[in-house]
Curated annotation (Swiss-Prot):
<feature type="compositionally biased region" description="Basic and acidic residues">
    <location>
        <begin position="77"/>
        <end position="89"/>
    </location>
</feature>
<dbReference type="InterPro" id="IPR037190">
    <property type="entry name" value="LIS1_N"/>
</dbReference>
<keyword id="KW-0498">Mitosis</keyword>
<feature type="repeat" description="WD 5">
    <location>
        <begin position="272"/>
        <end position="334"/>
    </location>
</feature>
<keyword id="KW-0963">Cytoplasm</keyword>
<dbReference type="GO" id="GO:0008090">
    <property type="term" value="P:retrograde axonal transport"/>
</dbReference>
<dbReference type="GO" id="GO:1904115">
    <property type="term" value="C:axon cytoplasm"/>
</dbReference>
<keyword id="KW-0131">Cell cycle</keyword>
<keyword id="KW-0206">Cytoskeleton</keyword>
<keyword id="KW-0853">WD repeat</keyword>
<dbReference type="InterPro" id="IPR006594">
    <property type="entry name" value="LisH"/>
</dbReference>
<dbReference type="GO" id="GO:0043005">
    <property type="term" value="C:neuron projection"/>
</dbReference>
<dbReference type="GO" id="GO:0005635">
    <property type="term" value="C:nuclear envelope"/>
</dbReference>
<dbReference type="GO" id="GO:0007281">
    <property type="term" value="P:germ cell development"/>
</dbReference>
<keyword id="KW-0493">Microtubule</keyword>
<feature type="repeat" description="WD 2">
    <location>
        <begin position="146"/>
        <end position="187"/>
    </location>
</feature>
<keyword id="KW-0175">Coiled coil</keyword>
Amino acid sequence: MVLSQRQREELNKAIADYLASNGFMEALESFKKETDMPGDIDKKYAGLLEKKWTSVIRLQKKVMDLEGRLAEAEKEYISGTPSREKRSPTEWIPRPPERSALLGHRAPITRVLFHPVYSVVVSASEDASIKVWDYETGDFERTIKGHTDSVQDIAFDHTGQFLASCSADMTIKLWDFKSYECLRTMHGHDHNVSSVCFLPSGDHVVSCSRDKSIKMWEVATGYCVRTFTGHRDWVRMVRVNSDGSLLASCSNDQTVRVWVVGTKECKLELREHDHVVECVAWAPAHAQLCGAAGDSNRRPGAGGAQGTGPFLVSGSRDKTIKVWDVSTGLALFTLVGHDNWVRGVKFHPGGKYLLSASDDKTLRVWELAHQRCCKTLDAHSHFCTSLDFHRTAPYVVTGSVDQTVKVWECR
């Protein structure tokens, strides 16, 4: 492309201003002489070269983003993937590129979580803060501060009125999510508190810790009312089932345990992982798991009997995801495909898919009925540590050691 005479003159004056403002006086005099530039440079050319340069970079970034979206759209068009309008919401899965990348944390993201009512996503980080973002606009809303060390996990009660957080500072905090006020701080663990969740009733919080214990706390008073012991090493995560009768926990001792909330009894110890078990998730009642496992996947002596659930999923540093039938204590099947530690697992609200996040930097979508990975997204530039799937809106969120939170649209 050839510049017009006027464009050439404007470019020369912008270059001259750049040379003058950076003190390259000899080069400026030589340049003015070579280009026959008269007198002083008009002030309107001040900083023009830098502005043009940065605008070109911004445009290049936008073009690359659009090219990526176009390539993905062409790929899906060729493969015959239907648009969202033609698909049932139970079929929607996250697709690249991300809708937004949320920047603000100064250390790795440990947990991401959608609010059950508001259009916000909450992130916890090793920078000891919790941040609130509008996932539709990508806008940062506020920072919640109070912990003095890495925030390890966060959880909402079913109304979204209360937020619980736990930290390496050995405390659990309860926050009013309207006023962002810390209502109470719960002390009792002797080491890093790694996970927290609400019982469905909202009147109790459950936590687990590197001190090998699981504790239940009364929300109204902040008192510890129950302690579950049995794990032989750091308890990484604890999650409660939909009716609040069972707890699932996983540990550095390479086991998953299922506990009866009312009696503190350890109902099951599941032992098939070969490394630290990082995460667990309960399957929704409508998850497509009952017919997913054939007899070949069962242990000898199972007699081919089909369990009725409930079902539980665990992700491990052995790079695998296991699906368990809690009624029989058997692993139904193992999902293999990640190239590094599995850090997060989450069921699709429709029950057809399972999503997983891994230190291989990917977000994977697994079709449960066929036990296969049907989509892999290169989600982050570093380890992918956490994910969540919105219960009603078509969004997935991921967090990473790269300090970003990414929102993905589903279709």
